[in-house]
């Protein structure tokens, strides 16, 4: 039987139905890789962050997420090179959709029960997204801003509904605004931690803070 069109599963009508010990024999998700590009680049290397945000409350199939991932990755690698960006898919397909297979051949009424026992069997996985939820994010250098925006624009053709592209005010994937990050980094109150950053808080052992943040100035008065 051919794959049912994704428009049949676009709207969030029922409760979330994840894979569990009661819901077995679920097909594998089509998307298996969620981070691409230079994943190990430090937080200081890619200050610019751009998001693709959903404008609708809907379901997106794992096939659509995989198609968008391939589309964005190909364009970014072609224009900027494989080490010029870090792409992350932030919508994960956990909701299981079902199908009640119906026969259309002659004598089908003798072989099946129609809409009796019509619960259906697992057919695929979709991601349930809300309005304002981030679907994909790219962190890169300021010089690659136009390339990243164009890559995410092309991804919009792989998704149903409407999306918008937002240039984040944060520094990369961190939680700090760009001005705040530069200021605290110069004072030694922030240290890189992969693609994120650790910040100096006012709790905990003073000796641990001195070991972690040797460049920070501590007011012990």
UniProtKB/Swiss-Prot annotation:
Source organism phylogeny: Eukaryota, Fungi, Dikarya, Ascomycota, Taphrinomycotina
Keyword Lipid metabolism: no
Protein's UniProt name: Large ribosomal subunit protein uL16A
Ribonucleoprotein keyword on record: yes
Subcellular location: Cytoplasm
Gene it is expressed from: rpl1001
GO molecular function: structural constituent of ribosome
Note: There are 2 genes for uL16 in S.pombe.
Cellular compartments per GO CC: cytosol; cytosolic large ribosomal subunit
Domain of life of the source: Eukaryota
